[in-house]
């Protein structure tokens, strides 16, 4: 018992020393001890005063990519929607399975409004990702990877009475990964890097809707 207490004390002292040496304030240290690391409120929650984590809320995610993007990345619209859906689900947001949405889209090629999807699946919100650009290569290079994309992420809230929807949230999203230097194709396969970037991009989009920790922000520079 005494040995265990001593180990705990030593670990606490080491953590405290690291914080002091790295410039942490005593207030921050105390906050960590009491409630854990500080979290960031989702931008969607701040702007709309609503939350996708509320009880009985269900969300559909759909992505649109123009022909010029799908020429190089054939299924990027479905892939990104799938990754974002999984991120939301992992953060306790109820979602429509992405394969069901893909099936509906395949059967309704002429759809043009997010509310059509919302009405069919009887959800409260539709997250609509309008992908304007997407690449996995460093500019001017064919053997260096760097994911880049530009998109508009909007949320459509379904009317409780009829099938209409209102756009209640919209944000431009510009993404780049890694931030500091590209990755050589000799170090990672194309498939591996693509998965890494889609994971990163989907988390950047997901953080608009779920809480995350400031420590995650610091450690995600790439």
Region locations from a protein language model:
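Stable alpha-helical elements in mature extracytoplasmic
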Residues: 76, 80, 84, 110-114, ...
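Short secondary-structure boundary motifs at beta->alpha junctions and helix caps
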Residues: 157-218
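Bacterial N-terminal signal peptides
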Residues: 12-22
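Bacterial N-terminal signal peptides that target proteins for export
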Residues: 1-12
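A structural "domain/chain start" motif
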Residues: 24-94, 210-222
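Short beta-strand->alpha-helix linker/helix-N-cap micro-motif
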Residues: 89-108
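Surface-exposed short loop/turn segments
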Residues: 108-166, 180
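Second-shell loop/turn segments in exported
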Residues: 65-75, 102-104, 139-140, 186-195
């Amino acid at each position: 018992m005494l040995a265990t207490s001593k180990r705990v004390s030593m670990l606490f002292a080491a953590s405290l020393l690291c914080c002091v040496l790295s410039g942490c304030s005593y207030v921050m240290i105390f906050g960590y001890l009491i409630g854990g690391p500080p979290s960031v409120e989702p931008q969607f929650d701040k702007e709309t005063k609503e939350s996708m984590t509320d009880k009985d809320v269900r969300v559909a995610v759909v992505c649109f990519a123009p022909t010029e993007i799908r020429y190089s990345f054939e299924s990027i619209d479905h892939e990104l929607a799938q990754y974002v859906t999984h991120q939301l689900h992992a953060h306790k947001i109820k979602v429509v399975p992405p394969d069901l949405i893909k099936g509906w889209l395949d059967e309704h090629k002429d759809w043009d409004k997010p509310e059509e999807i919302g009405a069919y699946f009887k959800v409260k919100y539709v997250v609509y990702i309008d992908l304007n650009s997407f690449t996995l290569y460093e500019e001017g290079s064919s053997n260096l990877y760097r994911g880049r994309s530009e998109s508009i992420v909007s949320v459509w809230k379904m009317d409780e009475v009829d099938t209409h929807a209102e756009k209640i949230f919209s944000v431009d999203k510009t993404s780049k990964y890694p931030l500091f230097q590209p990755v050589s194709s000799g170090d990672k396969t194309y498939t591996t890097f693509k998965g890494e970037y889609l994971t990163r991009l989907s988390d950047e989009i997901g953080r608009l809707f779920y809480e995350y920790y400031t420590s995650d922000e610091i450690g995600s520079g790439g």
